Regions:
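Active-site neighborhood of glycoside hydrolase catalytic domains
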Residues: 1-22
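A short helix->loop->beta-strand "cap" motif at the edges of active sites that frequently abuts
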Residues: 17-20, 94-96, 275-279, 331
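Hydrophobic targeting/anchoring helices
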Residues: 22-218, 319-322, 334-338, 343-347, ...
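A short, well-structured beta->alpha microelement
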Residues: 222-245
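Short, well-ordered secondary-structure micro-motifs within conserved domains or adaptor modules
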Residues: 246-259
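A conserved amphipathic helix/loop scaffold
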Residues: 260-457, 461, 472-473
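Solvent-exposed beta-strand/loop surfaces of large extracellular or lumenal domains
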Residues: 400-417, 484-504
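Surface-exposed interaction regions enriched in Ser/Thr/Asp/Glu
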Residues: 504-518
Length: 518
């Protein structure tokens, strides 16, 4: 249906001299699988009429509870990180455009503080991917600004608090300046986990007592890495025909305990990658009931008891190799005979899995895997950081420098920022401001128009939704002598260390005129 609709839209646009772009808004494969929904999203990527995707990741999807270390709970940042990564990797080999979505609220009835905390987590997670710089920032704005939601700790409902709308608008405005870059997130690169569309087909119903609580076979492969500060990559099996899929990948973890290969050809690409030097780690007992469904590996003359037997045979192994390490060409195959769900369902049961990966990485790359409890990425003047709980350390992360705190509505200037486990930080690095800039609104809760800079003055028009408060940090060459907001003189709140002026006034969608003289 989408093929017909998008093709018609493009042809109609062409007849009118318009180049119409068509994007598919979709949840991630992770979320659809978790929520037991089947979607054709990956197959749509190959349609010529599809220009890209809108990755619908927000608090509502990212807060789906999962298991780690035997504990089931919400892990919003970690889940969002994996969801955005899943969407990014789905389109990367095809070079399709990707928009990342965040939502300051969600459909479930929670309170404003809950929305704020989880918005920060998903917002930070999306910025961890420097190859994406296009965003959908506010689905259904009327719901955000006019909806009534609970005040934390009470049964009372109110519209969005001024403090939250100010912070949210400041965060959204920064995305106008975010650009793609070659900068990488901190942590050991090149470790991936294989996914496939068939993940969605194994979620329901349970058979013969075999189950996969909260999609634990997937999280068993990913969370033991992510929680140790490794930015695990997700690799889509449907993309293995593209060489770009394996670029920079050193180790690939896979399991057929919760998915199956829909085509035997995928094994050719996996085996070829191993033969050229890749390390493939297979985790699984191959005992789930879906191993015996009538499929290509056990029909039309094929007599494999499990699809993994076909893969192992491709790599000159026996059909059912025991646990151990095997060579194939220049590469390595490591077999672990345990379904990965057990790595997270049982407390402390992921150590052997992690040590297997760490040892394989050290042997292949000649260096140790870096373990830590945080991720940091720098994008221009913006520093994004996340510190995880349930990790290798309970220590906070301390960043030193000269920063504006973008997760604080008052935009304070800091020389040190401490981020606790389970929290995230978003900072404007003032030391990265170009010396060529004389005067500029660095950040704030309104959009800036009609900027005019002269030798001794700076003026602009600020626009933002009604019934919200603007707070802005304005870079100036020196302390101002006169400030006017809509003609009314204001007293300066000046920070000498950063050479910035703090401005605050009532927003107006028609525009607020600001003039500054020094």
């Amino acid at each position: 249906a989408l093929d017909k609709i998008f093709t018609y839209a493009k042809e109609y646009g062409k007849s009118k001299g318009l180049d119409i772009k068509c994007y598919v808004p979709t949840h991630s494969l992770i979320n659809y699988t978790s929520w037991q929904i089947v979607s054709p999203e990956a197959s749509l990527a190959s349609l010529d009429c599809v220009d890209g995707y809108i990755a619908q990741v927000w608090t509502g999807t990212a807060r789906e509870p999962n298991f780690y270390n035997g504990v089931q709970k919400e892990r919003v940042f970690e889940n969002a990180f994996l969801e955005y990564g899943c969407m990014k990797s789905m389109t990367a080999p095809l070079n399709r455009k990707m928009y990342f979505l965040t939502d300051p609220i969600e459909d479930r009835a929670k309170d404003w503080l809950d929305y704020k905390i989880n918005y920060q987590a998903t917002f930070a997670a999306q910025l961890m991917y420097p190859m994406v710089d296009t965003y959908e920032v506010m689905p259904w704005p009327d719901r955000i600004y006019q909806g009534l939601y609970r005040i934390a700790g009470t049964d009372q409902k109110e519209r969005i608090p001024r403090s939250y709308s100010t912070q949210m608008q400041t965060m959204v405005n920064t995305l106008n300046d975010i650009r793609t870059s070659d900068k990488k997130i901190t942590g050991t690169q090149g470790i991936g986990v294989l996914m496939a569309n068939s993940l969605m087909f194994q979620r329901f119903p349970n058979h013969n007592g075999y189950d996969d609580p909260q999609f634990s076979s997937f999280y068993g492969q990913t969370l033991p890495l992510l929680k140790r500060g490794i930015p695990v990559e997700l690799v889509h099996m449907e993309n293995t025909p593209f060489k770009e899929t394996f670029k920079g990948l050193h180790i690939l973890v896979m399991s057929y305990s919760n998915m199956k290969p829909m085509k035997p050809e995928y094994h050719n690409y996996l085996a070829d990658w191993v033969k050229k030097g890749g390390v493939l780690i297979y985790c699984g007992e191959d005992i789930d009931p879906y191993q015996t469904v009538l499929e290509w590996w056990n029909t039309d003359g094929n007599e494999y008891k499990a699809p993994s037997e076909h893969l192992f045979e491709k790599m000159n192994l026996s059909r059912n190799p025991g646990e151990g390490t095997y060579r194939y060409g220049k590469g390595t195959v490591i077999v672990m005979r345990e379904d990965p769900k057990h790595f997270v369902l049982k407390a402390g049961n992921d150590q052997k899995y992690f040590e297997t990966i760490a040892s394989a990485y050290q042997k292949k790359q000649g260096i140790e895997i870096e373990t830590k409890n945080s991720f940091i990425v720098e994008r221009g003047p913006y520093t994004i950081a996340a510190v995880m709980d349930e990790s290798v350390s309970k220590e906070p992360l301390t960043l030193s420098g000269l920063y504006i705190d973008l997760f604080d509505k008052d935009l304070p200037v800091l020389t040190s920022k401490q981020i606790q486990p389970g929290e995230q930080g978003y900072l404007y690095d003032l030391n990265k401001v170009s010396g060529k800039i004389k005067a500029k609104v660095l950040c704030g809760a309104s959009r800036i128009y009609d900027e005019k800079v002269s030798k001794q003055s700076y003026s602009f028009v600020a626009k933002s939704p009604i019934n919200t408060t603007n707070v802005s940090r304005v870079l100036l060459p020196c302390k101002p002598e006169k400030i006017r907001v809509n003609g009314k003189e204001e007293q300066p709140e000046w920070d000498e260390s950063s050479k910035t002026l703090l401005l605050s006034f009532e927003n107006d969608p028609a525009g607020v005129n600001v003039s500054i003289e020094w």
